[in-house]
Curated annotation (Swiss-Prot):
Pfam families: BATS, Radical_SAM
Domain Radical SAM core intervals: 63-290
Organism lineage: Bacteria, Pseudomonadati, Pseudomonadota, Betaproteobacteria, Burkholderiales
Secretion signal span: none
Reaction(s) this enzyme catalyzes, per UniProt: (4R,5S)-dethiobiotin + (sulfur carrier)-SH + 2 reduced [2Fe-2S]-[ferredoxin] + 2 S-adenosyl-L-methionine = (sulfur carrier)-H + biotin + 2 5'-deoxyadenosine + 2 L-methionine + 2 oxidized [2Fe-2S]-[ferredoxin]
Protein name: Biotin synthase
Assembly with partners or alone: Homodimer.
Organism: Paraburkholderia phytofirmans (strain DSM 17436 / LMG 22146 / PsJN)
EC number of the protein: 2.8.1.6
Function: Catalyzes the conversion of dethiobiotin (DTB) to biotin by the insertion of a sulfur atom into dethiobiotin via a radical-based mechanism.
Gene3D superfamilies given in the database record: Aldolase class I
MF terms in GO: 2 iron, 2 sulfur cluster binding; 4 iron, 4 sulfur cluster binding; biotin synthase activity; iron ion binding
């Protein structure tokens, strides 16, 4: 999958910065190269933030965020060996594996999420890939959540073509399937699923007409260039994802990444800003790891272009700031919670090749 977008070509550090300056304001030119994104990382912090905020305001109300709730509908027992994940059977984290939640319990949780202000309800199941029989109750969940007027998203692992089509027919708005990291660093994080496996699932989702939710995790021990490689992969998709969750590693005792040096907070903010610049129309979602951030750091992330947060008491198997604290922070910042600002793939004037795939609005 390829994406025509902005792409300066730096020759040295000074030229790289000049090209990065031009890139942020340019329209469609060419693919993003890893070196171009490294050049953005190397900009002075204030310059990068200014460019990200300019880009953000061109496409969104800078003082609104979407509130999303994520529910783990099937926890633990996953066959994959992702080094960061406590749900893997390969890691001794003390996590108790559970079966798929009943439909009525999921819908009850969605009702509470809506009452608390969420407009997007995400359902995650710890599978390598679901069996067809698993999808029937999930389709009922999707229909029930949509009937409440909530945007729907699921993350279930790898999908076959007919499975993606079935989820689309049930009315699914978004399918989440993260790349996690760059192709170069990927082998140090997971061995049970290839990078191409992930790209293939994303292509099936796109071909089915479902909006793509795809991002990654930073703080895994990757280098800046490898972080840039992740952003390049995302930004060069055709089209780039409508939804881009940026996760900050939450270290869980018993996983191989326990003890990994944490990413510098400003580097995390830079990553948010660069996601906004390179994917200007995407919803950039401040995801896992937010509980590790103080309020000032979260505010910088909003300034950098994050316009969605996962909201509530639990984010899959890691804790998340409580809903009341979130409400107070947003109020102090003058940020309003609003409904989804979804990017339709067939919108006129779309910056990337929109005519290839249709998606629900």
């Amino acid at each position: 999958m390829t994406q025509l977008n902005i792409a300066p070509t730096p020759a040295d550090t000074a030229a790289a910065n000049n090209n990065a300056n031009a890139a942020a304001g340019a329209k469609q030119v060419a693919r993003w190269r890893v070196a171009d994104i490294v050049a953005l990382y190397e900009l002075p912090f204030n310059d990068l933030m200014f460019k990200a905020q300019q880009t953000h305001r061109e496409h969104f109300d800078a003082n609104t965020v979407q509130l999303s709730t994520l529910l783990s509908i099937k926890t633990g027992g996953c066959e994959e060996d992702c080094a960061y994940c406590p749900q893997s059977v390969h890691h001794d984290t003390g996590l108790q594996a559970d079966k798929l939640m009943p439909v009525d319990e999921v819908l009850a949780a969605a009702k509470v999420a809506k009452e608390n202000g969420a407009t997007r309800f995400c359902m995650g199941a710890a599978w390598r890939n679901p069996k067809d029989r698993h999808l029937e109750p999930i389709k009922d969940m999707i229909r029930g959540v949509k009937a409440m007027g909530l945007e729907t998203c699921v993350t279930l692992g790898m999908l076959e073509t007919h499975q993606a089509q079935g989820l689309r027919e049930a009315g699914l708005d978004y399918y989440n399937h993260n790349l996690d990291t760059s192709p170069e660093f990927y082998g140090q994080i997971i061995s049970t699923r290839t990078y191409q496996d992930r790209l293939d699932t994303l292509e099936r989702v796109r071909d089915a007409g479902i909006n793509v939710c795809c991002g990654g995790i930073v703080g895994l021990g990757e280098s800046r260039r490898e972080r840039a490689g992740l952003i390049a992969q995302l930004a060069n998709m055709e089209p780039y994802p409508e939804s881009v969750p940026i996760n900050n590693l939450v270290q869980v005792e018993g996983t191989p990444l326990t003890g990994t040096e944490a990413i510098d907070p400003f580097e995390f903010v830079r990553t948010i800003a660069i996601a906004r610049i390179t994917m200007p129309r995407a919803m950039v979602r401040l995801s896992a790891g937010r509980e590790q951030m103080d309020e000032a750091l979260q505010a910088l992330c909003f300034l950098a272009g994050a316009n969605s947060i996962f909201y509530g008491d639990q984010l899959l198997t890691t804790s998340n700031p409580q809903a009341e604290a979130d409400r107070k922070l947003l109020e102090r910042l003058g940020i309003r919670a609003e409904a989804a600002q979804q990017m339709p793939l067939d919108q006129s004037g779309c910056e990337h090749s929109c005519d290839k795939h249709a998606a629900p609005n």
